[in-house]
Regions:
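Topology signature of small-to-medium multi-pass alpha-helical membrane proteins
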Residues: 1-139
Length: 139
């Protein structure tokens, strides 16, 4: 479980650092989408809190990380689909977001956190029930 804690803490730390970098360098989020900036601040705070929680109450923190990453991923995908500021064409805003490497990196990191947390929950339950293609045969 220690390895899972380290990997999950690293992923949450990367998520928090990328979020901080976006907040520090993205002028558009502060000028055109202030509520998005506040939401990102909340997600950064949750990521930082979950880093410490993973080492104290692992099961609750893993579930919290899954929920936080899921909500953040859905919110970010919602921004891509229809979260453009007033007066700006959706395609322009979508291209702006998808050209921003920090945004795409944060989006990818949320998927990674979700995969880690689901894997942490699922692996103990799969013991002895691996699909045939994944089963290691020992003679």
């Amino acid at each position: 479980m220690r390895i899972v804690r380290l990997i999950l803490s690293a992923a949450l730390g990367i998520s928090a650092l990328v979020g901080i970098q976006i907040l520090a360098t993205d002028y558009w989020i502060w000028s055109a989408a202030l509520t998005h900036a506040y939401g990102l601040m909340a997600f950064v705070g949750l990521d930082l809190a979950l880093i410490f929680a993973v080492w104290r109450v692992t099961r609750v923190a893993v579930f919290g990380a899954l929920l936080t990453a899921t909500f953040q991923l859905v919110a970010m995908l919602g921004d891509i689909v229809g979260g453009q500021p007033a007066g700006l064409p959706a395609s322009v805003f979508r291209n702006y977001l998808l050209a921003d490497t920090a945004y795409v990196g944060l989006l990818f990191t949320q998927g990674l956190i979700m995969a880690i947390t689901v894997g942490t929950w699922a692996l103990p339950h799969l013991h002895g029930h691996w699909p045939g293609a994944l089963r290691i045969v020992r003679h």
